[in-house]
C-alpha cells in the first residue's frame, strides 16, 4: 500500500502506532456515545411516531458499557490497520467503523437505524468504492460492480424478509437493514458482497 502522506512511516515504533490506534479508538468510541446522547430524538423514532420520554435526557452512559465497546472497537481498528497499513483505506474504514458503531448502538437500544446514519455510511462506502476502482482495485474491479453489489446486498435481505413473512409467518429484518446492506454492498462490490453477507449472518 502506498503511504497517504509523503512521510517515511517505516521508522515509527510499532508500539507507538498501536498506542495511537488504541487511544484513537477510545476517543472515537467516547465521541460515539456523546453523539448518541445529542442527536435529535426524532431520529430514533419511526416515521409516524413522536419521541417519548425515554428518548430525552441521557441515552447511553460510557461508564456502563463504554469500556467493552471501546475494546471491541479497538480490536477491529487494529485489524484494519494490520491489513491496510498507512493508507487511505485505513482512514475510510475508520470513518465507516465509527458510523457502523453509531448504527449498532441505535439499532441495539431502539431497534431503528436512522436515515442520517445510513446516508453518511452510503456516502463513505461509495466514495471508498470509487477511490478503490481508480487505484488499488482491492474490492472493485469494474464500475458496474458498485451498483450490482448494492442491489445484491439490499436485494438479498429483501428476499430473506419475504421468505420469513411467507414461510415463517413473521416479519424478518426491517427496511433499515436493507438500506444498510445497499451501502455496504456498494463498498464491497460484486461478488464480494456475498462474502460480506455470510460474515454478517455468522456474526448475527
Located regions from the model:
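A membrane-topology feature that recognizes alpha-helical transmembrane segments
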Residues: 1-204
Amino acid at each position: 500500500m502506498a503511504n497517504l502522506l509523503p512521510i517515511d512511516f517505516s521508522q515509527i515504533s510499532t508500539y507507538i502506532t498501536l498506542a495511537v490506534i488504541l487511544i484513537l479508538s477510545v476517543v472515537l468510541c467516547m465521541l460515539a456515545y456523546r453523539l448518541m446522547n445529542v442527536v435529535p430524538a426524532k431520529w430514533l423514532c419511526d416515521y409516524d411516531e413522536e419521541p417519548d420520554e425515554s428518548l430525552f435526557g441521557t441515552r447511553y452512559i460510557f461508564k456502563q458499557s463504554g469500556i467493552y465497546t471501546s475494546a471491541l472497537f479497538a480490536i477491529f481498528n487494529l485489524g484494519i490497520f494490520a491489513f491496510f497499513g498507512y493508507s487511505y483505506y485505513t482512514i475510510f474504514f475508520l470513518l465507516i467503523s465509527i458510523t457502523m458503531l453509531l448504527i449498532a448502538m441505535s439499532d441495539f437500544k431502539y431497534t431503528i437505524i436512522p436515515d442520517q446514519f445510513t446516508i453518511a455510511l452510503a456516502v463513505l462506502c461509495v466514495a471508498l468504492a470509487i477511490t478503490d476502482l481508480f487505484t488499488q482495485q482491492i474490492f472493485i474491479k469494474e464500475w458496474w460492480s458498485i451498483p450490482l453489489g448494492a442491489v445484491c446486498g439490499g436485494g438479498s435481505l429483501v428476499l430473506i424478509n419475504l421468505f420469513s413473512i411467507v414461510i415463517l409467518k413473521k416479519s424478518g429484518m426491517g427496511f433499515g437493514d436493507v438500506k444498510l446492506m445497499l451501502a455496504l454492498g456498494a463498498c464491497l462490490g460484486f461478488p464480494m458482497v456475498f462474502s460480506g453477507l455470510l460474515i454478517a449472518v455468522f456474526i448475527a
